[in-house]
Design a protein with these regions (language model features):
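Bilobed "Venus flytrap"/periplasmic-binding protein-like clamshell domains
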Residues: 1-36, 51-55
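Second-shell loop/turn segments in exported
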Residues: 3, 40-44, 84-85, 97
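A ligand-binding cleft/hinge motif common to bilobed small-molecule-binding domains
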Residues: 12-17, 40-41, 45-76, 115
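Short, solvent-exposed alpha-helical surface patches in well-structured domains
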Residues: 56, 93-94, 110-111
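Periplasmic-binding protein-like
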Residues: 59-96, 118-143
Length: 152
C-alpha cells in the first residue's frame, strides 16, 4: 500500500499495521501524484489518503471508472480548523457566529455541492462525493471541538 510521506495518513497506516500485525508493505510516496501513479501502474495495490483527495485524483485520471474509494473509514475523522488569535474572545465570537450562520443557513451545502458534486472549472471534473452524514450533522450543529469523537 502507498501513502504520501509526511501525512497523518501514512502515520495512521503504519500504526494500524503494527497494532494489528497486518504485515502490509507500506510505500511512502513523495506526493499524491506519485502515490496515485503507483496504483495506476500496479506498483501498489491501494492508496491510503483523505477521501476528497482520492476523489480528485480519480476524477482527473485516464480511467476514473477503474477506481473505487472504500466506504469504510480507515480512521476517525480529523477536524479542520480556522486559526485565529488566541487571546481575542470577541473576534472568536464573530468568527463562530459567521461560520455557524454559513453552516446552518444552507449556504455551506451550496458551496459543498459546487465543489464536490458538480463539474469544476476549468477541466469540468466532477468529484461525485455527496456530503456524508457526519459533515451534515456538523453543519446542523457546528462545534469547535478538536476531539474526533465529537464528529460522529
Amino acid at each position: 500500500m502507498v501513502s504520501t510521506a509526511g501525512t497523518t495518513n501514512i502515520k495512521q497506516l503504519t500504526e494500524a499495521n503494527g497494532a494489528r500485525s497486518l504485515n502490509i508493505n507500506i510505500i511512502p510516496a513523495k506526493d499524491h501524484a506519485e502515490a496515485f501513479l503507483m496504483v495506476e501502474t500496479d506498483r501498489a495495490v491501494a492508496f491510503v489518503m483523505d477521501d476528497i483527495l482520492l476523489a480528485s485524483l480519480i476524477a482527473g485520471s485516464k480511467a476514473p471508472d477503474d477506481y473505487v474509494i472504500s466506504k469504510d473509514a480507515f480512521s476517525k475523522p480529523e477536524p479542520y480548523g480556522i486559526m485565529l488569535r488566541k487571546d481575542d474572545p470577541a473576534f472568536k465570537k464573530v468568527v463562530d457566529a459567521a461560520t455557524a450562520a454559513l453552516y446552518t443557513g444552507g449556504e455551506a451545502q451550496k458551496i459543498y455541492d459546487k465543489w464536490f458534486t458538480q463539474k469544476i472549472p476549468p477541466k469540468g471534473l466532477n468529484l461525485n462525493v455527496p456530503m456524508g452524514s457526519e459533515l451534515k450533522s456538523e453543519f446542523a450543529k457546528p462545534s469547535d471541538s478538536p476531539d474526533p469523537d465529537s464528529y460522529k
